[in-house]
């Protein structure tokens, strides 16, 4: 046991160990045998279905999705650290897969915390129903790039997209590149 292990909860250690076996038994053998797929630019040629299905089987694809929708909730006070521990372990096998799962987790938290019940039902339903469904989000602007990490009102932020509340909803004006 390392010093780092002593700061993890028992659940985090268990989840990390499950992910470690997943990487050793599934991800690394696939990468070793199919390293040339890294250069296949077609979506269907990259990550085989069974990898996401296996990530679903060990319970990491739907982390952060409320249990009432069929997901796996985490203790709020440990959620971010749990995501970090698991993503680090997955990235040991394939950083691209880790990034895909991190996007699921980030968007799940945003939906859970900010979306209407209707949107939660719609999008969590899609994620739970289809083991190959992945969430994504778009954050950059022509002048903003990584400014998304700054506070929304930071004077040095170059993000131009604005949202304005109007009768019946919101109007969002901005530009993606």
Each predicted region: which residue ranges?
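Amphipathic, small/basic residue-rich leader segments at the start of a protein or domain
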Residues: 1-102, 119-129
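Generic alpha-helical propensity signal that fires on short helical segments
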Residues: 26, 78, 104, 108, ...
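Short N-terminal helix-initiation segments at or just after the protein's N-terminus
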Residues: 48-52, 104-114, 135-137
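Short, surface-exposed, polar/charged, turn-prone segments marking secondary-structure boundaries
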Residues: 90-93, 114, 164-167
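N-terminal glycine-rich flavin-associated loop
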Residues: 95-120, 145-148
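Glycine-rich, Trp-frequent "lid" loop and neighboring beta-strands that shape
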Residues: 118-177
């Amino acid at each position: 046991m390392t010093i780092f292990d002593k700061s993890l909860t028992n659940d985090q250690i268990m989840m990390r160990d499950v992910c470690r076996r997943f990487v050793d038994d599934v991800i690394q053998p696939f990468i070793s045998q199919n390293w040339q797929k890294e250069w296949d630019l077609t979506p269907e040629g990259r990550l085989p279905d069974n990898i996401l299905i296996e990530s679903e089987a060990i319970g990491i694809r739907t982390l952060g999705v409320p249990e009432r929708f069929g997901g796996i909730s985490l203790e709020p006070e440990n959620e971010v650290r749990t995501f970090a521990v698991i993503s680090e372990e997955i990235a040991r096998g394939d950083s691209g897969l880790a990034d895909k799962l991190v996007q699921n987790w980030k968007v799940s938290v945003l939906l859970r915390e900010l979306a209407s019940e209707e949107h939660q039902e719609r999008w969590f339903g899609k994620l739970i129903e289809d083991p190959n469904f992945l969430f994504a989000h778009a954050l950059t602007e022509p002048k903003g790039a990584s400014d998304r990490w700054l506070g929304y009102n930071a004077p040095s932020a170059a993000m131009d997209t604005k949202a304005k509340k109007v009768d019946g909803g919101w109007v969002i004006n901005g530009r993606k590149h």
